[in-house]
Amino acid sequence: MNDNNNSNFPKLVLTIYSTSFSTKENDGHYSGWGYRKNSVSFDYIQPPDVPSVLVPKIGIYSSHNETVLRYHCAMIKEIGVDVLLLEYYGSNHSDYFNMENEGFSDVTVKLMMKISKEYGLKIGFFIPYYNFQNYKTLDEDLQYISQNYANNPQMFKINNKLLILLSESRDINHFPSLIKKFNNLFFVGYFRYSTDVGAMMEDGYEGIFTYEPYEGNFWSSTIDNWKIISKIAKERNMLFIPTVAPGYNTSNSHRWISERMQRSRDNGNYYNKMWKSAIESNSPMVLINSFNNWIQGTMIEPAIEQGKLKYNVNVWGDKNSNSFKYIIQTKDLIKSFKQKT
């Protein structure tokens, strides 16, 4: 793919795929399924309790379980997704808390490269903010990706560069000098305000994305602005990727986060509304946040009730809903997006 202009890409759908999960049965320990009980605590919610609003239909699982990865890839391909953006916390860590877990991410990436190929999916990377992230750690992450993955044919590339989405990198001192070190990586950055776009272009970003699952929180995540953003990006020869989410609910994980950040699924209507605006923006790509982020409650992966965790219109759907509600809905929405001329 050449040229970053929004009009010069085929229509593609990407999804963020959480890779930090481990289980005692598969890996000898848990990661990804636990969360701090409050913002300053080192006391964690751990299985069998799960800090999410529902639980996976297949139960808690490991990102190293090939059977699970095949099940996911088959489902993701079936609904029309083209690219998996693997969450990447560094080669030797597994999750946000920067837990030392040597080689964990590498195993997941290598398994996904093999399995995604079987299902005709491509791989990119989403690098979120994590504890103690700084210039040095991000430099190490990017060097590792550049040296070990950028030339692999299974990776999704734009202008022969591996796609990298970065969530909070602009807050890191001297980050532009880091971008310019890697000529085999295509950087798309999260932004909040209209004034960010020009500055990010000067910094070396070749694209922008909205990322946030909570609509209206910033100028960029206000869906009524997406047509304008798409126009601004096109004028600067930058790629714009609007981000859609089915909802956002951290009431059982980030319990200290303000209620104003929560977004009800409204029985699927919130998701429909975001997709409608994404399609109308005429961007060639849409990002789903997420396939399986259970901690943030943004998952479309099939979910079931368990104990006190029940379906309702805020966290999933009404009493007539089933576990595949958002898989079915996503397939229909992707079809509408790809058919629009």
Regions found by a protein language model. Name each.
Residues N2-T341:
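Glycan-processing catalytic domains of CAZymes
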